[in-house]
C-alpha cells in the first residue's frame, strides 16, 4: 500500500539534502503516517485507516465521523 494519508491525501514530497559544502542530492520527505483503528458509533463497527498525524489532530478536534465525511466529499476515501 502506498504512503498516502487516507483522510487528507498527504503524500511524500521531494526535496534536497544539503551538505555543509552546499552540495545537493535528491531525497524524499515522507508523510508521518500511522495505521490506526477507529470506532464508528453510527455504523457500530471498527475501521482501520492509514492516517497522518495531522489528521489525528483533526479527528481529536472534530470527531471521526465529521472527518470521514469531509474526506469522502473531497474524494480521498472510497470506503
UniProtKB/Swiss-Prot annotation:
Q: Which domain of life is it from?
A: Bacteria
InterPro entries tied to this protein: Bacterial_rp_bL28, Ribosomal_bL28, Ribosomal_bL28/bL31-like_sf, Ribosomal_bL28_bact-type, Ribosomal_bL28_sf
Q: Which GO terms describe its molecular function?
A: structural constituent of ribosome
Q: Which GO terms describe its biological process?
A: translation
**Does the record carry Ribonucleoprotein as a key word?**
yes
Q: Quick check: keyword Ribosomal protein in the entry?
A: yes
Provide this UniProt record's keywords sorted from A to Z. Answer: Ribonucleoprotein, Ribosomal protein
Entry's family note: Belongs to the bacterial ribosomal protein bL28 family.
Q: What is this protein called?
A: Large ribosomal subunit protein bL28
Q: What species was this sequence derived from? A: Christiangramia forsetii (strain DSM 17595 / CGMCC 1.15422 / KT0803) (Gramella forsetii)
Amino acid at each position: 500500500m502506498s504512503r498516502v494519508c487516507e483522510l487528507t491525501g498527504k503524500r511524500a514530497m521531494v526535496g534536497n539534502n544539503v551538505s555543509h559544502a552546499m552540495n545537493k542530492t535528491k531525497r524524499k520527505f515522507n508523510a508521518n503516517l500511522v495505521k490506526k483503528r477507529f470506532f464508528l458509533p453510527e455504523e457500530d463497527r471498527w475501521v482501520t485507516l492509514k492516517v497522518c498525524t495531522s489528521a489525528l489532530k483533526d479527528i481529536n478536534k472534530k470527531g471521526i465521523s465529521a472527518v470521514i465525511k469531509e474526506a469522502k466529499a473531497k474524494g480521498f476515501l472510497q470506503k
